[in-house]
């Protein structure tokens, strides 16, 4: 489902295109919304939504929004730092680090975000609503909340060995 393009060293993925309708006195006015994910494959990732009367315009607006809304994710090599739970609306996501060679085991919208971020080994599951926009939002919340042991140790004023036990 995700369409992939390379541009400026960024991986651009089209996650979803939906037709929406505005009902007016004279009938319905149709337009399109696009959801895209952009990442450098090295810990920077962003998502955006665009809306226009035609699909290509909606996609270009969404890609522009995604480039503006990029975040940096602390990765542990090619996987996550620790297991993460997050939710947005009725969508709940669970992501956990996986050993080398596992691959990205995740569903549609989550897979696009994780691959764009540069995660190569992860186990992920989506619960509740599988609405693409909510799943992408929940995945971003989880990735944003993830912290490295070094940051936790610095915040607590302890060594990394004390934190990890």
Curated annotation (Swiss-Prot):
Molecular function in Gene Ontology: rRNA binding; structural constituent of ribosome
HAMAP family, alphabetized: Ribosomal_uS5_B
Membrane-crossing segments per the record: none
A Pfam family the protein falls into: Ribosomal_S5
GO biological process: translation
UniProt comment concerning the protein's domains: The N-terminal domain interacts with the head of the 30S subunit; the C-terminal domain interacts with the body and contacts protein S4. The interaction surface between S4 and S5 is involved in control of translational fidelity.
Gene3D superfamilies: 3.30.160.20, 3.30.230.10
Functional description taken from the UniProt entry: With S4 and S12 plays an important role in translational accuracy.
Keyword set includes Ribonucleoprotein: yes
GO CC, any one term: small ribosomal subunit
Origin organism lineage: Bacteria, Pseudomonadati, Pseudomonadota, Gammaproteobacteria, Moraxellales
Protein keywords: Ribonucleoprotein, Ribosomal protein, RNA-binding, rRNA-binding
Assembly information from the UniProt record: Part of the 30S ribosomal subunit. Contacts proteins S4 and S8.
InterPro entries: Ribosomal_Su5_D2-typ_SF, Ribosomal_uS5, Ribosomal_uS5_bac-type, Ribosomal_uS5_C, Ribosomal_uS5_N, Ribosomal_uS5_N_CS, Ribsml_uS5_D2-typ_fold_subgr
Family as reported in the entry's similarity comment: Belongs to the universal ribosomal protein uS5 family.
The S5 DRBM domain, residue ranges: 10-73
Name of this chain's protein: Small ribosomal subunit protein uS5
Domain of life of the source: Bacteria
SUPFAM superfamilies: dsRNA-binding domain-like, Ribosomal protein S5 domain 2-like
């Amino acid at each position: 489902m995700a369409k992939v393009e390379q541009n400026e060293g960024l991986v651009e993925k089209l996650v979803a295109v939906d037709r929406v309708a505005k009902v007016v006195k004279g009938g319905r006015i149709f337009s399109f919304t696009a959801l895209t994910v952009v990442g450098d494959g090295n810990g920077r990732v962003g998502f955006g939504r665009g809306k226009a009367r035609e699909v290509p315009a909606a996609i270009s607006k969404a890609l522009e929004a995604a480039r503006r809304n990029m975040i940096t994710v602390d990765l542990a090599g090619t996987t996550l730092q620790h297991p993460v739970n997050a939710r947005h609306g009725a969508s709940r996501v669970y992501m956990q680090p996986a050993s080398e060679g596992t691959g990205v085991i995740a569903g549609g919208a989550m897979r696009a975000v994780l691959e764009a971020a540069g995660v190569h080994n992860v186990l992920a599951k989506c619960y509740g609503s599988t609405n693409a926009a909510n799943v992408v939002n929940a995945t971003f919340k989880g990735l944003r909340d993830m912290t490295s042991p070094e940051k936790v140790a610095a915040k607590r004023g302890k060594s990394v060995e004390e934190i990890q036990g």
